[in-house]
Amino acid sequence: MISHTDHQLTLIKENIKFIPNYPKQGILFRDITALLENPHAYSACIKLLADHYKNHQLTKIVGVEARGFLFGSPLALILKLGFIPARKAGRLPRNTISESYVLEYGTGCLEMHNDSIIPGDRVLIVDDLLATGGTIKAVVKLIRRLGGEVYHAAFVIDLEKLGGKLLLEKIGVHPYSLVIFSD
């Protein structure tokens, strides 16, 4: 018999589309827009993440631009936590700190308001996908520079062969993913 959780995970997997050669040649993009269009699949993601983290004594959630906002914001509401956006450079109005990083298919820079984390905050990072881990490593650096503690990061998808999980574990962050693709 299939458990309710297994049914939810199957629903999530069925709503992730594969787009070859996007955003550039040689990349197999995992598209979550169909998942977002299906309220049952989207809700299943949020519920499973909330169930996993409800007893972790967190104080804040940081969502990574832009798709991390889609999962981090509703998760923060359910867990009754503050939500902090980690945004691309130049998009936040107050004083910020920044960190550069390397993507699977380029480079980037993320910023956070320099007063959004207070020393001792226990922070969960949320994004849609874990690839190489470079983006999340940059967010971890930002949070730790502000005095926050970060030991957990949540994802809908983990592209296992790209090594992000291993990178995060090396810096003391435990990744949790709903769906793991090993291809």
Curated annotation (Swiss-Prot):
Keywords: Cytoplasm, Glycosyltransferase, Purine salvage, Transferase. The lineage of its organism: Bacteria, Pseudomonadati, Pseudomonadota, Gammaproteobacteria, Enterobacterales. NCBIfam families: apt (TIGR01090), PRK02304.1-1 (NF002632), PRK02304.1-3 (NF002634), PRK02304.1-5 (NF002636). Pathway: Purine metabolism; AMP biosynthesis via salvage pathway; AMP from adenine: step 1/1. Belongs to the purine/pyrimidine phosphoribosyltransferase family. This is Adenine phosphoribosyltransferase. PANTHER family: ADENINE PHOSPHORIBOSYLTRANSFERASE, PHOSPHORIBOSYLTRANSFERASE DOMAIN-CONTAINING PROTEIN. Catalyzes a salvage reaction resulting in the formation of AMP, that is energically less costly than de novo synthesis. It is an enzyme of class 2 (transferase). GO terms for biological process: adenine salvage; AMP salvage; purine ribonucleoside salvage. Transmembrane segments: none annotated.
